[in-house]
Amino acid sequence: MKNFQDKIKKLVPEMRRVNQIHFIGIGGAGMSGIAEVLLNEGYQISGSDIAEGPVTKRLAEAGAKVFIGHQAENVAGASVVVASSAIDDSNPEVRAAKEARIPVIQRAQMLAEIMRFRHGIAVAGTHGKTTTTAMISMIYTEAKLDPTFVNGGLVKSAGKNAHLGASRYLIAEADESDASFLHLQPMVSVVTNIEPDHMDTYGGDFEQMKATYVKFLRNLPFYGLAVMCADDETVMEIAPQVGRQVLTYGFSEKADYRIEDYQQTGFQGHYTVVCPNGERIDVLLNVPGKHNALNATAALAVAKEEGIANEAILAALADFQGAGRRFDQLGSFIRPNGKVMLVDDYGHHPTEVDVTIKAARSGWENKRVVMIFQPHRYSRTRDLFDDFVQVLSQVDALIMLEVYAAGEAPIVGADSKALCRSIRNLGKVDPILVSDTDQLGEVLDQIIQDGDLILAQGAGSVSRISRGLAESWKA
């Protein structure tokens, strides 16, 4: 391990006067990834979170000092404190650090420091960035380039969401939710799409959000590369403002890397990419949906422009196991009314839910789609209420869970009852509101039919609930 750390230090200068780094919210996907990379670089890592889980256990086993609960004394000995976006100035550890004159920085500022002496590839966008980051990471790994990667979700092929590589490459998911991606200084940036989300960060102004993406892309050096989705109207609107080399990808005839002849069979997608030089590349993709073909083509475009051979690109995509909680098959189960398939998916924005439903319809044409949906945040439910009503009305049967608040106070008219009422009034599906999740299995058994595909959809506790359901069904 020491020889590996010495190799890294030759590649990347160490942060002087920094010995111990403390993470508040260390169990979060993005925070844990950075902590793991820095731990493997040889820094002392400590951190706290409100609850113990698999991530905190793994970090503790790797050598991090992990505290459960936030206490002022937890920051003792820290050279710098990294706080997740969910942590505010009232946190006792933040207050203690500031009183002790210990620097308190955002997650993205630490990621930017890791990226500063590396060849950075940053993936941004409202949807698809976790999967696209994972795909690029696996392509570079397949090409024997041993990249460092920091992802916002599990890279299933690697079995983790972060890895410290011995090369100069760093592939990272860039977070627009708090505009902290502006700290990053990559060599290559990908923008998958831009839609209104996390609008509190941008004062409710979509124009401000678009301008922030332009600033992010202008962080590229003049010799950098922006890889942008030609199918997204907003992305194409800002492309002329970037002032850097831009390459596009998508189904659009105007795309530089153009997708043709997409077909889906079950979990696999088959299509052709036409490259800027006219080269045609036939792709077998091991995850379903046109949205994943877009993600994969963004990854392919980055890899081609960076000089990676087709063989490595195609092998990585054909073997890609997906990102955690992205159309994640939990299994097939025999229930009283027949055999069903249970899938867990993180999508919590109407566009994400829509593409998940479309992927299910394309790959399993003869199956009914039964959705267990848990709205995520009252503010998102309010801001995108009508879109949710339209999208959720596409399924054959709908079970609605209560809103996962994520720390927000309830908003009148933006709860699950209101969603159910509006969906019912549209007349396409009659939703069932399940407030007590202990009753979910019983309710499901009353409505499911032989051959159904059940989608557990959302970013909150619905994943834990659906996995618990799967375990009980296995028994």
From Swiss-Prot:
It catalyses: UDP-N-acetyl-alpha-D-muramate + L-alanine + ATP = UDP-N-acetyl-alpha-D-muramoyl-L-alanine + ADP + phosphate + H(+). It holds the Pfam family Mur_ligase. GO terms for cellular component: cytoplasm. The keyword Transport does not apply. Keywords: ATP-binding, Cell cycle, Cell division, Cell shape, Cell wall biogenesis/degradation, Cytoplasm, Ligase, Nucleotide-binding, Peptidoglycan synthesis. It is found in: Cytoplasm. Signal peptide: none annotated. Its main location: cytoplasm. InterPro entries: Mur-like_cat_sf, Mur_ligase_C, Mur_ligase_C_dom_sf, Mur_ligase_cen, Mur_ligase_N, MurCDEF_pg_biosynth, UDP-N-AcMur_Ala_ligase_MurC. Its EC number is 6.3.2.8. This is UDP-N-acetylmuramate--L-alanine ligase. The lineage of its organism: Bacteria, Pseudomonadati, Pseudomonadota, Gammaproteobacteria, Pasteurellales. The gene is murC.
